[in-house]
Each structure stands twice: as structure tokens, then as C-alpha cells.
Amino acid sequence: MTKFNYIYFKKDKKLRILNSKLNSKLTVVFLHGLKSDMEGKKPLFLNRYCKKNKVNFLSLEYAGHGKSYGKFENGTISKWRNNVKFVIRKIIKKEKFLIVGSSLGAWLGLLQFQDFKKQIIGFIGIGSAPEFLDRLIWQKLKNNEKKQFFEKKFYLLKSDGY
């Protein structure tokens, strides 16, 4: 059975993590996609694979995802990036690691190179979605929708069923 834990991001804000520490010199860090969590097939498979091969494994649920603190609609790329950075600093410290990112997780993984370029030994992007906000959303908004975004600092998109 998989054992999830929590780490305090701030005084009253907990992030749910999956940390399989096997005393390896390498850690595989899995970063999930938008509106996903650590209970999907990819993170659970990678965790089992790492255990079988005696490699450390780490994953987390960003704010507003899974069972971590906060509401999804209050999340931003910057907040989620900082969640990842915090957990890596707290758990992995100065050790080497490999990032596996799925969709949004690949984008967040790429951003980690700005802070951990000497520690990251590899990167695997699965269905990588860097800058999906610009191409898939922003460019399709009408001018009045963009104006509303700048005035209110957010714009509520109609759901496409996802």
C-alpha cells in the first residue's frame, strides 16, 4: 500500500507528498498534470519502479490539487512552481535528481532548472504543456475577455467538460 504524507509549506498550509527514500544517490521527482494528483497510474507506477530498482522517489500535490491545501482557482503557475521548489529543497536538499513531468508538471519541471540546474541530471516530459495558457487559452480569448482579465485580474472560462 502506498503511504502518503504531508509537509508544511507554511504554518497552516500542508502539501501532500509521496516520498520513498531508499538511500540512493538519485531521486526521481514526478510532477503531475493540471487538476491531477498522485493517485494516478503514472506516479504510482513510477514509485513501484523506483522501489524495485532501489532509487528514491518523490512526488507532491500542488496547492489546490488532490489533498493539498487551498482551492484550485487560487492557484497560479508561480505558486505551484514554488510548491515544487520548496519540497525539493526540503526533501532532496543538495542531492541529484531526475524530473519526470506530465503535462503541466513538465512545465513546472522545466522551471526548476532555474533553481536547481546543477542538481538536475535529466528531464522527461510526458505530453509536455509549456506555455499552454498562451497558445490554448490567451490567443483564443476575445478582446473584451482580455480586458475583463486585466480589470479583475482573472477571467472565468466556461467549462469544456474537463
Residue locations for each model-derived region?
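Catalytic nucleophile-loop/oxyanion-hole region of alpha/beta-hydrolase
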Residues: 66-91
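Conserved alpha/beta-hydrolase
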Residues: 43, 47-69
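Gly/Ala-rich beta-loop-alpha elbow adjacent to hydrolase catalytic centers
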Residues: 101-109
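Short beta-strand element of the alpha/beta-hydrolase
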Residues: 25-33
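Short beta-strand immediately N-terminal to the catalytic nucleophile in serine-hydrolase-like folds
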Residues: 99-101, 126
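N-terminal cap/lid segment of alpha/beta-hydrolase-fold proteins
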Residues: 1-23
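The alpha/beta-hydrolase serine catalytic core
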Residues: 107, 119-162
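Short substrate-entry loop that stabilizes the transition state in hydrolases
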Residues: 35-41
